[in-house]
Amino acid sequence: MQLLLLIPLHYRLKDSKRIYQIILNLGSLLRISSIRQDNMELLELIIDPMIKAEVIERVSEFLTKTLGKIIVKCNDTSGFIANRVGYFLLELVARKAISQNLDVATIDKIFTTFLGLPSTGIFGLYDLIGYDVMKLISSSLLASLPANDAYHKIICKDPCS
């Protein structure tokens, strides 16, 4: 699944003033350079409750009718959905496959053929994203997710252990 992000964010200043913005990020944190933005069908929409409904409607209409995107409404929670779901899947499958000594090519074939992952498969995608980026995403998720989040159960702090 390829995601395009639309993220309305609000910031609280020290003097309690709020600034509300809608930021269009026509890319993805997990963006792969060979994927063009017009190929990304889904668009993640996180709405601050203080943003007026008519603003959301106008932006949504533009994104769906003009850009042809499918909007996925998400709660404002730690980690973008692409990272929360995608990274969890990559880590879980990679760790299970390695711990159970499963064939990497077979795992990649299963996920591309039956589950519609990109042709890179799990391990190819992990490699394409890069260990350094995967580690940054992991650190961010570990720091921001509650202790009872399922992510904490699949990740080990030291990738070599």
From Swiss-Prot:
Pfam family, one: 3HCDH
Domain of life per record: Bacteria
Gene3D superfamilies: 1.10.1040.50, NAD(P)-binding Rossmann-like Domain (3.40.50.720)
A GO biological process held by the record: fatty acid metabolic process
Stored InterPro entries: 3HC_DH_C, 6-PGluconate_DH-like_C_sf
GO molecular function, one term: oxidoreductase activity, acting on the CH-OH group of donors, NAD or NADP as acceptor
PANTHER family the UniProt entry points to: 3-HYDROXYACYL-COA DEHYDROGENASE FAMILY PROTEIN (PTHR48075), 3-HYDROXYACYL-COA DEHYDROGENASE-RELATED (PTHR48075:SF7)
Designated name of the protein: Putative uncharacterized protein RC0841
Biological source species: Rickettsia conorii (strain ATCC VR-613 / Malish 7)
